């Protein structure tokens, strides 16, 4: 019987060491060597203090900043420990009521014309750090007015921070809200 169990135990130990120790250490080493910023969360610091991550959205308030898309992560939104979408069906009355309220709030804040879809819809994770260029441009007037800046200067800033499709064909053009707001803080 021991002759039958020995190969099984040997394989268990070998694969445990291979997949539980060697592989994770190798991948961590490769990540830290080739992509140290991304492997550590793409954290952004200002004055030695971490102000956010380029990979995780955060709630931004205040008229002088660009706002991210709505979040369904946690009760108050943007809870990284509770990342999720709303899981509401497209026919859900609760979803319809929330979107209607969001559209009304945007209209009250001065939005005119078409409203970008991501201005009123949540992402799958609830923590998307990006918004569409259309949603960013919709906010230019409000942000410029709050900061006493020319709209053209803020529009130029947005245009310069639009990220294209990955590898030229995957995804949609987008703007990282944290990058945009930090760049906005440098304008005079």
From Swiss-Prot:
Keywords: ATP-binding, Cell inner membrane, Cell membrane, Ion transport, Membrane, Nucleotide-binding, Potassium, Potassium transport, Transmembrane, Transmembrane helix, Transport. Its main location: membrane. It is a single-pass membrane protein. One of its GO terms (cellular component) is plasma membrane. The keyword Iron does not apply. The keyword Zinc does not apply. It holds the Pfam family KdpC. The chain crosses the membrane at residues 11-31. GO terms for molecular function: ATP binding; P-type potassium transmembrane transporter activity. It is found in: Cell inner membrane. Part of the high-affinity ATP-driven potassium transport (or Kdp) system, which catalyzes the hydrolysis of ATP coupled with the electrogenic transport of potassium into the cytoplasm. This subunit acts as a catalytic chaperone that increases the ATP-binding affinity of the ATP-hydrolyzing subunit KdpB by the formation of a transient KdpB/KdpC/ATP ternary complex. The system is composed of three essential subunits: KdpA, KdpB and KdpC. Belongs to the KdpC family. This is Potassium-transporting ATPase KdpC subunit.
């Amino acid at each position: 019987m021991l002759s039958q169990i020995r190969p099984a135990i040997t394989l268990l130990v070998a694969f445990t060491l291979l997949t539980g120790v060697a592989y994770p250490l190798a991948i961590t080493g490769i990540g830290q060597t080739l992509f140290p910023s991304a492997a550590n969360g793409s954290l952004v610091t200002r004055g030695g203090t971490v102000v956010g991550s380029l990979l995780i959205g955060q709630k931004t308030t205040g008229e002088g900043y660009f706002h991210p898309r709505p979040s369904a992560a946690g009760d108050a939104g943007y809870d990284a420990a509770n990342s999720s979408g709303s899981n509401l069906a497209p026919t859900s009355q609760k979803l319809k009521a929330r979107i209607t309220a969001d559209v009304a709030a945007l209209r009250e804040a001065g939005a005119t014309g078409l409203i970008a879809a991501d201005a009123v819809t949540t992402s799958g994770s609830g923590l998307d750090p990006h918004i569409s260029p259309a949603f960013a441009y919709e906010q230019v007037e409000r942000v410029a007015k709050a900061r006493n800046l020319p709209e053209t200067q803020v529009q130029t800033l947005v245009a310069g921070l639009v990220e294209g499709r990955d590898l030229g064909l995957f995804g949609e053009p987008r703007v990282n809200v944290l990058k945009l707001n930090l760049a906005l803080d440098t304008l005079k």
